[in-house]
Amino acid sequence: MSVINRMSEIIGLAPIADKIEFICDSVVDCDAYTRSKIEYLVNGRNIPAFLLIPKGEGPFPAVLVNHQHHSQRNWGKSEVCGLVGDPLQDFGSKLARAGFVVIAPDAICFEE
């Protein structure tokens, strides 16, 4: 038994799927990368996210980008992808331009 499976068993987590199914709502060309609006299912809940994929040949490293938690609950994934808010929070698009695949989900009760 792997360490991850054993830890999941100890703390009562559901088994981790090898692949996560998702739907793609839209794709936008952002010069050095594409930004896809996606939704995926986790524990019965749809999670909206942006998926930023660099152009060119991979493989590419990947990173999960979480947004800040503040009074602007209508901002979430869009702020870290440079669409709204504080330009200093726009690190998702900078990472995509640097060659990283970025997934930027909304936290519960933010944006969508």
What are these regions (language model features)?
Residues 1-6:
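Predominantly extracellular/luminal regions of secreted and cell-surface proteins
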Residues 7-19:
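Glycine-rich phosphate-binding loops of nucleotide-dependent enzymes
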Residues 16-58:
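N-terminal cap/lid segment of alpha/beta-hydrolase-fold proteins
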Residues 22-24, 38-40, 64, 95, ...:
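Generic structural hydrophobic/aromatic packing signal, biased to beta-strands
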Residues 49, 59-70:
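Short beta-strand element of the alpha/beta-hydrolase
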Residues 58-59, 98:
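Residue-level preference for short coil/turn positions at secondary-structure junctions
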Residues 66-112:
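Cap/lid segment of the alpha/beta-hydrolase catalytic domain
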